From Swiss-Prot:
Pfam families: Ribosomal_L18p. One of its GO terms (cellular component) is cytosolic large ribosomal subunit. The keyword Transmembrane does not apply. Coiled coil: none annotated. One of its GO terms (biological process) is translation. It comes from Cupriavidus pinatubonensis (strain JMP 134 / LMG 1197) (Cupriavidus necator (strain JMP 134)). The keyword Transmembrane helix does not apply. The lineage of its organism: Bacteria, Pseudomonadati, Pseudomonadota, Betaproteobacteria, Burkholderiales. This is Large ribosomal subunit protein uL18. NCBIfam families: L18_bact (TIGR00060). One of its GO terms (molecular function) is 5S rRNA binding. This is one of the proteins that bind and probably mediate the attachment of the 5S RNA into the large ribosomal subunit, where it forms part of the central protuberance. Belongs to the universal ribosomal protein uL18 family.
């Protein structure tokens, strides 16, 4: 089992547990150049809010690359604002098998500070 397969296995387990809880899900996806966040509905089929470092508005706030903890903080605040505008206050955090460290942790902390509960 390689590194990617192990991450996907962990992600599958997490998503199965979140699906049992029947709550909205905040999902994070991390690449070498960007970080993406989406809030899915309780059934998991509808995207209620999304934010990423690939968005023009976010790139204007950043001075440089989108693959930093500072960029993840901006995305975390933005996803929390969009989720609250869509009427979502409480979510389950789905780290998609990534370690809760660095950019993933920065995004989660910023979303919590901006008012999302998880």
């Amino acid at each position: 089992m390689n590194k990617k397969d192990a991450r996907l296995r962990r992600a599958r387990q997490t998503r199965a547990k979140i699906a049992e809880m029947k709550v909205n899900r905040l999902t994070v996806f991390r690449t070498n150049s960007h970080i993406y966040a989406q809030v899915f509905s309780e059934c998991g089929t509808k995207v209620l809010a999304s934010a990423s470092t690939a968005e023009v508005e976010v790139r204007k706030e950043l001075d440089g690359k989108g693959a930093t903890a500072a960029a993840a903080t901006v995305v975390g605040k933005r996803i929390a604002e969009k989720a609250k505008a869509a009427g979502v206050e409480t979510v389950a955090f789905d780290r998609a098998g990534f370690r809760f460290h660095g950019r993933v942790k920065a995004l989660a902390d910023a979303a919590r500070e901006a008012g999302l509960k998880f």
